[in-house]
Amino acid sequence: MIIMYAIGIGDNKEEVLKAYEKLKEEGIEVELIDNPKLLVDKLLDGEIDGAVRGSLSSSKVILYLRERIGKFYRASILKNPFTNGIFLLSPVGIDDISEDKNERIKDKIRIIEFASNFLKNYNIKAKVAVLSGGRLGDLGRNKVVDETIYEAEEIVEHFKGNVDIIHNGILIEEYLKDGYNIIIAVDGITGNLIFRCLGLICKIPGYGAVILSDKNVNFIDTSRNANWERYYNAIKFLIGGDFG
């Protein structure tokens, strides 16, 4: 039997094994791999069609993947609790975008372009919401917040007239209620925290984080603290591109 997909198994073995058994019940054979480099190499060398990080260490898998394919970004696919559609949240990797302001803006612009193309592949029109650190009326209260507001406005201006894009401060709940499907976090730390609050604490369903890159890499990043459903959903998405 040819095995076309693999899941990394490190910490949190029990949840990975639950996903593995559930997939097996459905006739889907998945290889479990405990070596980060082997997981990446098998994917990029064409031995498997898709890979899920599973519960392997991010610092090992992601750094090695970056060595192999160069720069990329990650976008978590989550269910919108208000619309039942999906949305992409990015950046979610703590080192996905630059600490330098100008480079950070360029990174976010690239993320929006990649994420818009990703949704287009599923016949979903991109609606982009850029987060900043406070309400627009908070301008002048905190220098760090002010910078995030100015940065968000600069990004919106870049796409003006070409992309359905909005900046209305920190109000992520309003963006989601209005059906925005690409949420751009202030930085990777903020994005990671949002994902953990929504996905791991509030249990909003998700499919892992896709790779946003100029290369076609069939890899899904997942948290090592996820429950079995996230690993299961990631494999199902790789197989059929179905958001369930």
Swiss-Prot record:
GO molecular function term, any single one: methyltransferase activity
Cystine bridges: none
GO biological process: methylation
UniProt key word Transferase: yes
Keywords assigned: Methyltransferase, Transferase
Family classification: Belongs to the MtxX family.
Protein name: Uncharacterized methyltransferase MJ1371
Native source species: Methanocaldococcus jannaschii (strain ATCC 43067 / DSM 2661 / JAL-1 / JCM 10045 / NBRC 100440) (Methanococcus jannaschii)
